[in-house]
Regions:
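Conserved functional acidic sites
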Residues: 1-157
Length: 157
């Protein structure tokens, strides 16, 4: 074992509520994207390399025609203010709190959705703390954790 984090499957359940529902309870509308390594020729992928290197590209998940996600390592030395492209959509205070030139940034995309991608940001000792869609500016960020002293000072969102 080299410390690489493998991704062996996921169960997706998309729920939706509809106008006029009484009671207004979400209903299961699709399970697209679910996969399990070893079933129906699905393969495990890698969530995070033990020793990431800028330029590496690897499969995050693979279920033919269902889940074909790819990760590309963009940087292993991210620090806010150095690369303006990687800063786009990133909350400055969050990046400054967690990244001292040692964060990993990935570009994640699906072979099934050409042109769509997100960037994910990983901090040492914490892991994934931010996901940014540069086109829509949608941001998903860590708001708390209890296993690293840096988490105590996470900026309010």
């Amino acid at each position: 074992m080299d410390g690489t984090t493998w991704y062996c499957g996921e169960q997706v359940k998309d729920l939706e509520s509809f106008d006029g529902d009484n009671p207004k309870l979400p209903e299961l509308v699709k399970i697209d994207g679910s996969f399990k390594a070893g079933r129906d020729r699905d393969k495990p992928g890698i969530i995070f390399q033990a020793d990431p290197k800028a330029g590496q590209v690897y499969l995050e998940e693979f279920s033919l025609g269902n889940a074909e996600d790819v990760t590309e390592i963009l940087s292993t030395t991210y620090k806010f203010g150095v690369n303006h492209e990687l800063d786009r959509g990133v909350p400055k205070s969050l990046a400054q709190q967690l990244c001292a030139g040692d964060c990993v940034v990935t570009r994640n995309y699906s072979l099934l959705e050409p042109g769509a991608f997100a960037r994910k940001y990983y901090a040492p000792g914490i892991g994934a703390f931010l996901e940014v869609n540069p086109k829509t500016r949608d941001v998903v960020q860590l708001v708390g954790c209890n296993f690293d002293p840096k988490c105590a000072a996470l900026p309010a969102h």
